[in-house]
């Protein structure tokens, strides 16, 4: 069974890059789902078993969450997923504590700094 990954990133170029990095970093048993906004990400998570992941047949194992999105903030999603059994990684342009510490408090397991060249 493929490991499911959700990538929430509103910038199509950055999202494509993250997809490529995930594919190249892991085996070919990866199934990547892409979302460009919070609404779509929430819908994909519901399909995989809801915010707890307990009822899903195959929940996401890794979720990459952009902090700044057109329809909200990625920390909103992190707060909703505190019981979800996936590793949650924040992707952001900002390396300061004002952005990273709150994300970690909301349930992020780590962060990945993005370049601003996208």
Describe the residue ranges of each PLM region:
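Acidic catalytic/metal-coordinating carboxylates
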Residues: 37, 73-76
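Conserved acidic carboxylate
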Residues: 9
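The feature encodes the CheY-like receiver
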Residues: 70, 96
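Acidic, metal-coordinating helix/loop segments flanking the phosphotransfer/catalytic sites
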Residues: 34-62
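Two-component/phosphorelay signaling modules centered on CheY-like receiver
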Residues: 12-36
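Active-site residues of response regulator receiver
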Residues: 66, 92
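Short amphipathic alpha-helix used as the core "switch/output" element in two-component signaling
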Residues: 75-86
């Amino acid at each position: 069974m493929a490991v499911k990954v959700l990538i929430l990133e509103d910038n199509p170029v950055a999202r494509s890059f993250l997809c490529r990095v995930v594919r190249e970093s892991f085996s070919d048993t990866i199934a990547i789902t892409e979302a460009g906004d919070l609404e779509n990400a929430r819908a994909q998570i519901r399909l995989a078993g809801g915010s707890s992941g307990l009822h899903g047949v195959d929940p996401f194992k890794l979720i990459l969450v952009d902090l700044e999105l057109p329809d909200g903030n990625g920390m909103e999603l992190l707060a909703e997923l505190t019981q979800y059994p996936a590793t949650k990684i924040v992707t952001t342009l900002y390396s300061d504590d004002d952005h990273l510490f709150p994300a970690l408090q909301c349930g992020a397991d780590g962060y990945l700094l993005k370049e601003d060249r996208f």
